[in-house]
Amino acid sequence: MTDKKVNVPLILLVVAIVVALLVLILFLSLGGKNDDVELTDQVWEGREYLASLEKKDPETVKQIRKELFQQEIQEQLENEREPLLEQLMSGETDPFSLYKDYAILGDSRAVGFWYWGFLEKSRCLSDGGHTIRKIPEWYDKLEEMNPSYIFLCYGLNDCSIGYWDNGEQYAAEYVEYVKELQKRLPDCTIVVSSILPAQDPAFERSKRWRDIPEWNVVLKEACAENGILYADCDRLYEEYPKLWDPDGIHFREAFYPYWSSLLIATALIGGQENAG
């Protein structure tokens, strides 16, 4: 039998055409959805809808497009935040290695950051009995330090001391102190930590500590409304209740890496509900 001569160039040309057609079909089927920012179906449908409205009401469409862009950025932040949090909470990344040029203000609970040797004592402006009304006393010191990050870790004494009748009054005053800090240190990132709850037998000392969850709800809303970063630490109580001291108020040494992880992740990337 006579062997047939194979036309290699022709075969390669056919293969190239087939591949090109497949790529074209794939692109058309995706409809150009593979932008630099990965979009949800909801955002994509919104863009298609806006295209049909743009000629009718351009100003309204312009505002909606801005909101959609912010939603896309929010999704990007969330996608970055979760892997970082996972690395920090698992111990894969040492959270304290990320603390550069900072100041921590707070009460006796915040003292633990330097007491256990995690952070510099000179940068932890905290002591037993302190409330947010101590913040103005640190204004000059903070301006001198000019830190890149400030972490506010108050709430336990604030809730029980009686200066505020409810969470609304407390949150309103808290926001004013943060705004003053922002005015004095415009390049500083400020993070408000949620109030970490107490547990038995602490309630024998103050029944008002049972109101901490309610105060947190109000404080979180106030921060969101005023563009203030809020570190929601509720998960720490749910996941690590045994890391509270026997007094039900303070924390064991092993607690601080978890708390610091949530604080620094919020400062670097934003919270689960980022400030606008």
Locate predicted features:
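N-terminal secretory targeting modules
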Residues: 1-99, 270-276
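Conserved SGNH/GDSL esterase-like catalytic core that processes O-acyl groups on lipids
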Residues: 89-173
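Active-site flanking residues adjacent to catalytic metal/cofactor-binding acidic residues
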Residues: 105-107, 193, 231
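Alpha/beta-hydrolase-fold catalytic nucleophile elbow
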Residues: 153, 193-194
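Charged helix-capping and loop-helix junction motifs
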Residues: 167-177, 209-215
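Hydrophobic positions in alpha-helices of CheY-like receiver
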Residues: 177-181, 223
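A short helix->loop->beta-strand "cap" motif at the edges of active sites that frequently abuts
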Residues: 185-189
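Catalytic His-Asp segment of secreted/periplasmic serine-dependent ester chemistry enzymes
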Residues: 198-276
